[in-house]
Amino acid sequence: MRLIFFLVEGDIGPIRGFLRSSIGSRSAARVVPLYYKKFFAKNGPTEIAREAWRYAIKRAFRNIAAPFSTPFAKNFRLLAVSIYRYFLPDGHFPCGVYVFSDLERLSSEGITKAKALSSILAQSLSAVRILNDPTRTMLRYDLLRTLYDQGINDFDVYRPMQGETPRKFPVFLRNENNHDGSISILIENEHELAYALRELRERGNLTSQVLIVEFSNTANENGIYAKYGAFVVGDRVFPKNINFSKNWMTKTSCLYDPELLEQELEYVHTSPHQDLLERIFALGKIDFGRIDYSMVNGNIRVWEINTNPTITNARAMRFGARKPVYDLVEARMSSALEALV
């Protein structure tokens, strides 16, 4: 049995929550969530390989203890091979897929270690596939700057700690290494920007991770902002949902009018932006994650790609009018994960 090792830096909740859901549990026998630090703490390829085999052994025991989840014979073979390789890895890692998620949350040192781990995996004598290879995958600043340079986005992004200043206003501030959204109100001019940056500096929060982002207004004629979400899992791209809000910084849906819910349902069934999304994921060299974006007159505005996204929504939201959307998306996610192995 091939496994999917899902590496995270900060929050293991998104993938674990999905695997505990009624639909996501179909993939639980194959997916092994674990923290980067489990590998980073090991010295050299042999010790790293042994750590991977240790988790393969744990997963095999768990699957054998739940005989109705997967065929017994496959898990017994995985257990036997894992125990053997644990004592003598000999250049082998467990066969399967290694997903480097949470890349945007890694420190500079963490990125360096992730690149080293990726190189070790690439030299494995086993059949190993790497998603979000940290030696290739673009992080937020590089992605947004590339999308602007390519004419896909109409807004640019800047690093104030490197002396970069915006060419147009309004702008807002955000951190590059999290998904909490804006850390400022809309800033209308250079004087307001200088004041906002000075406040951050005085609080000790003006770091190299702070970005200046030009504001792009995507509200419709009714003042409603629609934030689309779509997943990439290996070679598959599929919609997640649309969040509607009157707030320009849209994190979750605040509006549930019937016509908006119908628009969301149509979106997840038809995936109208499929070709463009595939192009953007390929451009960023991102194999696993969720893109957040809006549409204006047929043109896309990409806000970010989260490499450790929420998959299963809160239990209270899984009922009512949006339940068909969540069920469909989770079924597609489970199918996409199975297709990896």
Summary of predicted features, one role per range:
Residues 11-20:
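Short N-terminal binding/cap micro-motifs at the start of the first secondary-structure element
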